[in-house]
Every structure is written in structure tokens, then in C-alpha cells.
């Protein structure tokens, strides 16, 4: 893999658009580890992470000043331009999520570590979290010090998917600050919704195309039983996104069910399954989901 150029974050070029063609071997995805290394249903979350082995590759920071953007603090070993459109967009992400999901604001600081090459990122993640599958980015929460600034971290690298990956991981972080827990499928579905550019209104063109090609059999009850990220493959991520998009954009009754469920999750990490609540409000959720997907048009 070729190294990302420092021009990614220079004062003359926008962060997201100065990236050339980069070959990727990492897939988007999530992981959750409990305090003793036991998997939990929180997406892309590692608790008790600080107890792991020291790393040979250092995480970014110390060479350049950190950049504070709202509740996010960015660290990199190359200069970061505060006026970059990416940072302006990320500064608006928490309010966008709060408004859409009817959730309160969280005040936790999220530390974001931007490696300047894929090699450095992979090396650090292999050394620090050797049991994790390869992913382009991770959200990490250390449960040892609740509400401390350093507890919430995002790790990623400056590749061509940086903008999408940061929206995705920071969505996890924002949800983590206000919810007591969130089912894996819902965590991923919401992150998949908000990882899209605001102009897309949560619509993922790639997911939509693949789901409409045929062979898609939605089964929310099955998806709700997926507890480990290792069992979340691309079809599961697509279906999770589809259900969230349907709830938020396809049916007013479904949106109310989701909003109520999220309110329950603020105090109760396990308020039961969403699927029975959805069936009680929507006569045929599967048929309604198909109709919703059929009506969508990819953004131009």
C-alpha cells in the first residue's frame, strides 16, 4: 500500500479530496470487547483497552498540535487545516444525529487518531488489539474511567474512505455518549445511515443497488440475534441499514417505534427486541420494507 501524502491535510488542499487512488485490504466493520475480552453487543467498542500490550508503532499526536472541533479532538503527525470542509461537516454531525433521533446532546470528548498511512494504522492495531479483525477504522471505549475525556477514541487512517469512515465511527461515539447500550444491528444500521453525506439523506446507493437486484430476504428477528461482529457480514450490514432507513424515512409509525426504542435505550441497555414492537405498529414490516426500497432513487 502506498503511503498517504502529507498534502492530505495541507493548507492548500481539502483533506478528503487530496487523496489519490489507494489499494485497500481492510473492510468496514465493527468489534466489541468487554472488560475481560468477552464480546459484547456494542458495535466497534473496546472496553478495558488500556490494559493491553504496549505497541511498537505510536499513535499520532505530539508532533503537531491537536485540533479541537466541537466535542472531537483530532491528532495527526501532519498539519490539520481547521477550515477543511470535512471538519466543518463533522462539527455538525452530533446535532444532525440528535435532531434525527430525538436524542439529547452528549458532552463527552472523543479523541480521533488519524494515521498518515495504512501501514502505520495496521501495525498499531495489530500490536495494541491483536485479537481484532482487520477493519479500516475502530471506535474504542475504555470502560475503566467512565466519562473521562480519554475514554472514547476513534482510530483510522487517511485513505480514500476517510470521510465516510469518520462519519461512521463518530456516529458510534455519539450514540455511546447518550445510550446505555444499543443492539449490534441497530448500532451498525444507524452508523450506516449517518455515514452518508448529508445530501444523501441517509441513502446508501451501493446498498440500495445490491438489495434491489433480487435474492434479498429481510429477517429482522434473525438480524437481532446476531451478537458478535464476526457474524456481521456485508449482507447483515446492508439489511441493518435498510431497516434503519425504512424506520426513519419510510413509515411514520415505524419512526415513532424507533424513537421510542431509542428513548428506552437511554436508561435500559436491554429493553427487548425491536421487531415485535415494529410488527405491532406496521401490519407487514417486510412488505413495507420492500415497497420503501423500491421507491428510493439514488442521489445524483
Describe the residue ranges of each PLM region.
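Positively charged, low-complexity intrinsically disordered regions
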Residues: 3-4, 8, 12, 51, ...
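Acidic/His/Gly-enriched intrinsically disordered linker/tail segments
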Residues: 131-156, 160-161, 177-300
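Internal hydrophobic scaffold segments of catalytic domains
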Residues: 30-35, 109, 115, 188-197
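Short acidic, Pro/Gly- and aromatic-enriched capping/linker segments at domain boundaries
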Residues: 45-66
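Sec-dependent bacterial lipoprotein signal peptides
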Residues: 1-30
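Bacterial Sec signal peptide processing site at the extreme N-terminus
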Residues: 28-48
Amino acid at each position: 500500500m502506498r503511503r498517504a501524502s502529507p498534502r492530505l491535510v495541507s493548507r492548500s488542499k481539502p483533506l478528503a479530496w487530496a487523496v489519490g487512488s489507494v489499494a485497500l485490504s481492510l473492510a468496514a466493520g465493527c468489534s466489541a470487547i468487554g472488560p475481560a475480552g468477552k464480546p459484547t453487543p456494542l458495535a466497534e467498542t473496546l472496553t478495558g483497552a488500556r490494559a493491553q500490550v504496549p505497541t511498537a508503532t505510536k499513535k499520532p499526536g505530539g508532533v503537531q498540535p491537536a485540533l479541537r472541533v466541537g466535542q472531537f479532538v483530532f491528532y495527526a503527525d501532519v498539519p490539520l487545516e481547521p477550515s477543511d470542509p470535512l471538519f466543518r461537516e463533522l462539527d455538525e454531525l452530533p446535532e444532525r444525529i440528535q435532531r434525527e433521533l430525538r436524542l439529547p446532546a452528549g458532552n463527552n470528548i472523543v479523541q480521533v487518531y488519524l494515521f498518515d498511512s495504512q501501514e502505520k494504522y495496521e501495525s498499531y492495531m495489530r500490536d495494541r488489539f491483536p485479537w481484532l479483525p482487520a477493519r479500516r477504522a475502530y471506535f474504542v471505549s475504555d470502560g475503566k474511567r467512565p466519562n473521562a475525556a480519554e475514554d472514547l477514541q476513534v482510530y483510522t487512517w487517511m485513505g480514500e474512505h476517510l470521510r465516510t469512515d469518520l462519519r461512521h465511527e463518530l456516529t458510534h461515539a455519539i450514540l455511546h455518549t447518550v445510550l446505555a447500550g444499543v443492539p449490534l444491528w441497530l448500532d451498525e444500521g444507524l452508523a450506516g445511515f449517518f455515514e452518508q453525506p448529508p445530501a444523501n439523506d441517509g441513502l446508501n446507493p451501493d446498498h440500495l443497488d445490491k438489495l434491489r437486484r433480487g435474492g434479498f430476504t429481510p429477517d429482522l428477528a434473525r438480524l437481532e440475534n446476531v451478537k458478535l461482529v464476526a457474524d456481521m457480514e456485508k449482507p447483515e450490514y446492508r439489511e441493518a441499514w435498510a431497516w434503519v432507513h425504512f424506520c426513519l424515512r419510510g413509515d411514520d409509525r415505524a419512526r415513532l417505534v424507533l424513537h421510542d426504542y431509542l428513548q428506552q435505550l437511554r436508561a435500559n441497555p436491554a429493553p427487548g427486541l425491536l421487531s415485535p414492537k415494529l410488527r405491532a405498529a406496521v401490519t407487514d414490516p417486510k412488505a413495507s420494507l420492500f415497497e420503501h426500497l423500491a421507491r428510493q432513487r439514488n442521489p445524483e
